[in-house]
UniProtKB/Swiss-Prot annotation:
Domain of life, source organism: Bacteria
Oligomer status and interactors: Homotrimer.
Biological function: Catalyzes the last two sequential reactions in the de novo biosynthetic pathway for UDP-N-acetylglucosamine (UDP-GlcNAc). The C-terminal domain catalyzes the transfer of acetyl group from acetyl coenzyme A to glucosamine-1-phosphate (GlcN-1-P) to produce N-acetylglucosamine-1-phosphate (GlcNAc-1-P), which is converted into UDP-GlcNAc by the transfer of uridine 5-monophosphate (from uridine 5-triphosphate), a reaction catalyzed by the N-terminal domain.
GO molecular function, one term: glucosamine-1-phosphate N-acetyltransferase activity
Protein name: Bifunctional protein GlmU
Annotated gene: glmU
Keyword field contains Kinase: no
Binding site for UDP-N-acetyl-alpha-D-glucosamine: 8-11, 22, 73, 78-79, 100-102, 137, 151, 166, 224, 330, 348, 363, 374
Subcellular location: Cytoplasm
Pathway: Nucleotide-sugar biosynthesis; UDP-N-acetyl-alpha-D-glucosamine biosynthesis; N-acetyl-alpha-D-glucosamine 1-phosphate from alpha-D-glucosamine 6-phosphate (route II): step 2/2; Nucleotide-sugar biosynthesis; UDP-N-acetyl-alpha-D-glucosamine biosynthesis; UDP-N-acetyl-alpha-D-glucosamine from N-acetyl-alpha-D-glucosamine 1-phosphate: step 1/1; Bacterial outer membrane biogenesis; LPS lipid A biosynthesis
Amino acid sequence: MSLSVVILAAGKGTRMCSELPKVLHKIADKPMVQHVIDTVKSIGADSIHLIYGHGGQQLQEKISDGSLNWIKQAEQLGTGHAMQIALPHFKNDEKILMVYGDVPLLSEKTLTDLIAAQPPGGIGLLTVELDNPTGYGRIERMNGEVAGIVEQKDATVAQLSIKEVNTGILVADANDLSRWLPALSNENAAGEYYITDIIKMAHLEGRIISAVQPESATEVEGVNTRLQLANLERAYQLKKATELLLSGVMLRDPNRFDLRGTLTCGVDVEIDINVIIQGNVNLGNGVVIGANCILIDCDIAENAVIQANSIIEGSSIGARATIGPFARIRPQSVLKEEVHVGNFVEIKKSTLGNGTKCGHLSYIGDSTLGQRVNIGAGTITCNYDGVNKFHTHIGDDVFIGSDCQLIAPVTINNGATTGAGSTIMIDVPENALAIGRAKQRNINNWKRPTKK
């Protein structure tokens, strides 16, 4: 039997105090609803129906997924109403899984367990035990079997004491839903159509409702406020940090680590505090990442050391290289083995050959540097004329003196040296010394102006 998933994502999210639709607020730099979409895809959903309402245009612009079937809920009249408008899109011979776009941490395992637990002709229901169940629908049982769900607004004092609550996530057969959904009523305190009412309908028909619980209550927590969003962000990050620690990565403090993408690590990797990982990052064996670094879509080879407060984006760092502190490596840069880039150096769209050093206070952009090059402090590649970018080529074993300006396009050939303070505008031959600076002039008996 095929599986269709309905994601409820029509809520406005008033308590978020934001113009952004609630489900577009992010966990780990990814919209909550995208987390849900990715999870249901991972369990093999054959079709995904996304119920949208508030901010529908924004939602469709941000979630550009051609595999989704978008269904508009013009009026938000409850979860049952959302499923009623989705009903015409169901096939009779498929299972229907209903989830929420603002419950981002739901795991693949929990959903797989829920689907497997659904009895023939019955309902699989995800529930959770909470010490403080305020606000949730309570699970009513008869002789141990799930018999119904009563919402907080409609519950009696006795029912309010029940700790087992409904998460709102369930799976049922489409042919049964086609009978139950049209029979829903809005005669309740909220005047809404509750999907939970189908539980009682199924029970009255003698159908079995099988309840499954997640490994962690955090999985089924929804987001209505920014505080709840922040709490789930921390829960997500701590889970990822725990996975890394158990795999052998040394995190100095798992509470001060942010993974906002995918991280692959070799053995004996060390990561200090306040490191942020974005996109796809690969760290080789023995890599050390200092405090406060940001790594974005980069590859760092074995035994490289990235010192504190450095940013590396869209680049590759070779084995045994040392970067930072306070270095910035911008996209499309390739730093090969044993390269050293020191403090307050920016590298952009450049290649640095094996053993090349750029110690401090320099900008290298749109450049190719050979092996064993030394870049003196304060060196700038002047690559932009206000319209176009130009390339600088520096050969092997070149020594660039401090405070040089290299006016691109220019080539400095193997073994050449530039004198400190030079402005290099023409190509430099192999093994030549290039000096491009004004002759020093001394004015004797000079007196500085004095303040009056």
